[in-house]
Amino acid sequence: MSQTQEKKKNSWELRDVILMACIGLVFAIVYLAVFNVGLGISAALTGTGFSDFAFDVIYGVWFMAGTLAAYIIRRPGVGLITELLASVLELLFGNSGGVAVVITGLIQGAGTELGFALFRYKKWNLLSMTVSSVLSGIFIYFYELFYLQYYMLAPMMHVGHLVIRSISAFVFSALICKLIGDGLAKTGVMKKYAIGQNVKKAVVYDEED
């Protein structure tokens, strides 16, 4: 691939920005709803010894915007910007976390972006999505070590948080996002995006066989 083709492949188009905005908007609403679900789970588990892990079970949901957008559009920067946008909108829609919500969005988006960057933005599959999602969970956990004073927890609590959060990241942000992206691509509505082009190529190859 020539430098001109590579530059064109990695440059954003208006339709990319529009889709990122739409995904950010949808998941801002989802994030806010899931936050309230987490509060409910935490309250229900109070006294059981498991309430500290309530949010970890659903934490993977908060990585979905960036992962899904990146999987569909497949350009550098998409995961970071979409996740950040979703967090800003979540704050505007009423999340009481204040500026910390935006900071977490930025950190989570950075984890997503690094995951795909490790594959040089050339591998768009369940493995790269899993790496991106798990890195998002690890990144935000290091932030919470200080912001939420998790550094005071016992070592096994750290293990518990990271393991549960990583599983949640895989289920929601990797597996479910891949199913959503692939499902949308098969309908043809994503034919102008990289994911749709890949589906089109796969169909052509099948016909040739």
What are the language-model segments listed below?
Residues S2-A69:
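Hydrophobic transmembrane alpha-helices
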Residues T4, K8-W12, D16, S51, ...:
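Membrane-helix interfacial "entry" motifs
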Residues D16-G24, I103-L145:
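Short helix-perturbing small/polar motifs within transmembrane alpha-helices
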Residues V17-C22, G60, M64, G77-L84, ...:
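Hydrophobic alpha-helical transmembrane segments
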Residues I23-Y31, A65-G66, A86, E90, ...:
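Alpha-helical transmembrane segments of multipass membrane proteins
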Residues F35, S87-L114, Y147:
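Interfacial aromatic-anchored transmembrane helix boundaries in multi-pass membrane proteins
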Residues A44-T48, K122-D209:
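Membrane-embedded alpha-helical hairpins and interfacial helices in multi-pass inner-membrane proteins
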Residues G77-A100, A194-E207:
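Cytoplasmic juxtamembrane regions at transmembrane-helix boundaries
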